[in-house]
Structure formats: structure tokens, C-alpha cells
From Swiss-Prot:
Gene coding for it: nrdR
Function in brief: Negatively regulates transcription of bacterial ribonucleotide reductase nrd genes and operons by binding to NrdR-boxes.
Bias type Basic residues, positions: 176-185
UniProt-listed HAMAP family: NrdR (MF_00440)
Cofactor: how and how many bound: Binds 1 zinc ion.
Name listed for the protein in its UniProt record: Transcriptional repressor NrdR
GO biological process: negative regulation of DNA-templated transcription
Entry keyword annotation includes Translocase: no
Family classification: Belongs to the NrdR family.
Length: 185
């Protein structure tokens, strides 16, 4: 493999191990010419997928683009990167093993929405607003209504097993942090 730093033709593998979910092999490499160190990931590709876009254009499937779109939806959300990687790998595997060499952009979008719905509600709404091209507030209200119905049907505990937040009328103000206020004389 060519060195990304100096362009040297050969690099040496120093360490090789499977990723957490065994969907990829992580390799640490070093360049003998410049001493640069970098990491590569090797993944199994079941078949070459072609994405059929809404415009009718055909483009090669890009796993990195899928990862980036999910990362954008999850920006500033505290979701474990391993869970995100499992989601991306699962969607990719499902698409590759679907039997068809071509997959529609709609099928990819629906798979991402389904995955985000189980991962993070805010990211789900963000992605849906772009994917479904929301134009007005009513579009958000409709989506939030279906999301609320889903949450009501799950019972008292959210998916992660933590206690549900208190309803707004039962919220108690948190104690102040820092030094206590001085009494004025």
C-alpha cells in the first residue's frame, strides 16, 4: 500500500486485528521511507453495489457517504461510535446480501431511518427532515406524532433501560452549584 505521507510504494503492517464486531480488519502500518504511521481498515465486500438515484443516474455505492450522512444526523449527540459502526455495517451487509446488484437511494434512506429510529430519536428526526424534504412545521409535527405514538406503546422505560424523565409538571429545580449565596446584612 502506498504511503499517504510521502507516496512511498511500500508500507509494512505492524499490527493487525479484527474490529469489535469482526466486520473489518484494522491494520497499523508504517512507511520504511519516512517513518509515517497510519491505520487502514479492510472490509469484506460481498458485491459491487450500484445506487439508482431519483434522477435515474447510477453511481457506485459509497459506504463512507453512508457513514457521513449518519454522522451528520448524529452531530452533537452522545451515541457510542461502536453502535454507529454496527449500524453502518448492518445496513451495508443488508444491502449487499439483498440479491440485487442495484439498490435505490430510497431503499438506503429507509434503511437509515429505520436504524436511526432505534438508535437516537433526535438523529432520526434530523435525517427524516432532510430525506423527506420537510417544507413546513406541520411535517415535523406529523413525524413527531408518529414518534410519540411509538414511544407511548413501549411502556414506562425507554429502550436503554433508564428511567423515563419526569413529566414537565413534576420537574423539580436542580440544586445550585458553586458557593452558597452570601447573606446580606
Amino acid at each position: 500500500m502506498r504511503c499517504p505521507f510521502c507516496g512511498g510504494p511500500d508500507t509494512q503492517v505492524k499490527d493487525s486485528r479484527p474490529s469489535e464486531d469482526s466486520s473489518a480488519i484494522r491494520r497499523r502500518r508504517v512507511c520504511p521511507d519516512c517513518g509515517g504511521r497510519f491505520t487502514t481498515f479492510e472490509r469484506v465486500q460481498l458485491r459491487e453495489l450500484v445506487v439508482l438515484k431519483r434522477s435515474g443516474k447510477r453511481v457506485p455505492f459509497d459506504r463512507d457517504k453512508l457513514q457521513r450522512s449518519i454522522d451528520v444526523a448524529l452531530r452533537k449527540r452522545t451515541v457510542d461510535p461502536e453502535r454507529v459502526e454496527r449500524l453502518v455495517s448492518g445496513i451495508t451487509r443488508r444491502l449487499e446480501s439483498g440479491g440485487e446488484g442495484e439498490v435505490t437511494s430510497e431503499a438506503i434512506g429507509e434503511a437509515v431511518m429505520e436504524g436511526l429510529k432505534g438508535l437516537d430519536d433526535v438523529a432520526y428526526v434530523r435525517f427524516a427532515s432532510v430525506y423527506k424534504n420537510f417544507r413546513e412545521a406541520q411535517d415535523f409535527q406529523d413525524l413527531l406524532g408518529t414518534l410519540g405514538e411509538r414511544l407511548e406503546g413501549e411502556g414506562d422505560l425507554p429502550e436503554d433501560g433508564e428511567a423515563a424523565p419526569a413529566p414537565p409538571d413534576e420537574v423539580v429545580a436542580a440544586p445550585r452549584r458553586g458557593r452558597p449565596a452570601r447573606k446580606r446584612a
